[in-house]
A protein has these predicted regions:
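Active-site rim elements
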Residues: 3-8, 75-82, 126, 130
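Short, contiguous alpha-helical
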Residues: 8-12, 16-19, 27-71, 111-164
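Acidic catalytic patch
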Residues: 98-113
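Helix-adjacent hinge/juxtasegments
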Residues: 57-101
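C-terminal ligand-sensing/allosteric alpha-helical core of TetR-family HTH transcriptional regulators
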Residues: 14, 21, 47, 51, ...
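Short, solvent-exposed, charged loop/turn and helix-capping segments
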Residues: 25-28, 101
Length: 164
């Protein structure tokens, strides 16, 4: 299995896990905001789409041309938001699926510190974005618990889905 194939398999598996978590969220709690410094649940869920939006701009090395542009706003309708997250993933992964090994080795500009750009390979950026998705999914699982919903199994059992 190539590094590209491994990434695609892992990214698609993680996307399915993320969608499982998002689908478990109660639509009457989208404005839940656990702290003033945090996003509400709707906006945090939309981060999964925004990461793919940003990923496309990074893929095209647009960060050297200034801010990546105003990202699309989160849909108010939860099902539209879920569809948007799924579409963003599929569109972004389309770039990856078409990429050659040389495309993945190409250096692009990405944040390496506060207000600081550095060069990274596209493959390294892909893994960074995937890890960031997993991080935000962990945050979202806390929102799910705080909303009173059941937290589904992601990698193993949860209090709501014991395996034994």
């Amino acid at each position: 299995m190539t590094a590209k194939d491994s990434f695609i398999r892992t990214a698609d598996e993680e996307h399915a896990r993320t969608m499982k978590l998002l689908r478990a969220y109660p639509t009457d709690k989208l404005e839940l905001k656990p702290h003033d410094m945090l996003k509400n649940a709707r906006d945090l869920a939309w981060v999964f789409a925004l990461e793919r939006y940003l990923g496309t701009r990074i893929w095209n090395d647009e960060l050297t041309k200034g801010a990546p542009g105003k990202p699309p706003a989160a849909p108010q309708n939860w099902n539209e938001l879920l569809s948007g997250v799924d579409k963003a993933h599929q569109d972004f992964m389309g770039l990856v699926r078409k990429a050659s090994d040389d495309d993945l080795k190409k250096k692009v500009h990405f944040f390496v510190g506060p207000k600081q750009l550095g060069e990274m390979s596209r493959m390294d950026v892909l893994w960074f974005l995937l890890h960031d998705q997993i991080h935000h999914r962990g945050q979202f699982s806390i929102y799910l618990r705080m909303s009173g919903a059941k937290v589904p199994s992601i990698y193993g059992p949860t209090a709501d889905e014991p395996w034994m």
